[in-house]
């Protein structure tokens, strides 16, 4: 019975690692035809966000400026002007197709992410017993380390998350999440989140050190503060 109880969380741990990847891959493949058909038959002229509309308008303006430039610097025969118009028409059609495909991918990724988060939430709720065992494993492993190694591990983790160079990492991660969910890039929102998350984590860490580590292992707190200085 104890052996079975020890082995039970192992498949659960493997599922936590590989399940998001498997869900994303499978639902992307299965939902793509449906989303493509729905979006194309909807014939929507609405852009999913302002940044997409801005990019498309910029491309159209570039095409228009190229035509005006060609007409200004040289006097082309009518046949050449006609070829330019045909080329611009083809480029416009290609631009619309690319934008349409980008919209489909944004809807597909957003839907897949929502489904993945929902399934993982249910998976965590149903696997409460396995999570308790995994938590006991982590605590046992952590307590078996020396105080110096514990302090070094905490210091390394905090420097990665809330250290001097961490804002750039937070900016990349939040920007990637924004892009994956199809949201428009907003420097003000991203800067606000980057300046807020490290402060919250730093507050939680200090509270944990003061109320938990200081009671469980005072020597660890002393070593941590010495290394941090």
From Swiss-Prot:
Keyword rRNA-binding carried by entry: no
Gene this protein is translated from: cemA
Entry similarity comment: Belongs to the CemA family.
A GO biological process held by the record: potassium ion transport
Localization in the cell: Plastid, Chloroplast inner membrane
Native organism: Ceratophyllum demersum
Role, per record: Contributes to K(+)/H(+) antiport activity by supporting proton efflux to control proton extrusion and homeostasis in chloroplasts in a light-dependent manner to modulate photosynthesis. Prevents excessive induction of non-photochemical quenching (NPQ) under continuous-light conditions. Indirectly promotes efficient inorganic carbon uptake into chloroplasts.
Organism classification: Eukaryota, Viridiplantae, Streptophyta, Embryophyta, Tracheophyta
Protein name: Potassium/proton antiporter CemA
Molecular-function GO terms, alphabetical: antiporter activity; proton transmembrane transporter activity
């Amino acid at each position: 019975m104890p052996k079975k109880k020890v082995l039970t969380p192992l498949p659960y741990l493997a599922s936590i690692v590989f399940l998001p990847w498997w869900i994303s891959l499978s639902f992307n493949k299965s939902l793509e035809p449906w989303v493509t058909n729905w979006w194309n038959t909807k014939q929507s002229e609405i852009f999913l966000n302002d940044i997409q509309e801005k990019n498309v308008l910029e491309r159209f303006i570039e095409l228009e400026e190229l035509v005006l430039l060609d007409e200004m610097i040289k006097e082309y025969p009518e046949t050449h002007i006609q070829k330019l118009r045909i080329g611009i028409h083809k480029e416009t059609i290609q631009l619309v197709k690319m934008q349409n495909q980008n919209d489909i991918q944004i809807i597909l990724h957003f839907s897949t992410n929502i489904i993945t988060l929902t399934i993982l939430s249910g998976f965590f709720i149903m696997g409460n017993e396995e999570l308790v065992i995994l938590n006991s494993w982590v605590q046992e492993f952590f307590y078996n380390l020396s105080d110096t190694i514990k302090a070094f591990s905490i210091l390394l983790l905090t420097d990665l998350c809330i250290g001097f160079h961490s804002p750039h990492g937070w900016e990349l991660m939040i920007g990637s999440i924004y892009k994956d969910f199809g949201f428009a890039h907003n420097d003000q929102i991203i800067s606000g989140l980057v300046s807020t998350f490290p402060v919250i984590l730093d507050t939680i860490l200090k509270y944990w050190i003061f109320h938990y580590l200081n009671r469980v292992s005072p020597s660890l707190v002393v070593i941590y503060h010495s290394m941090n200085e």
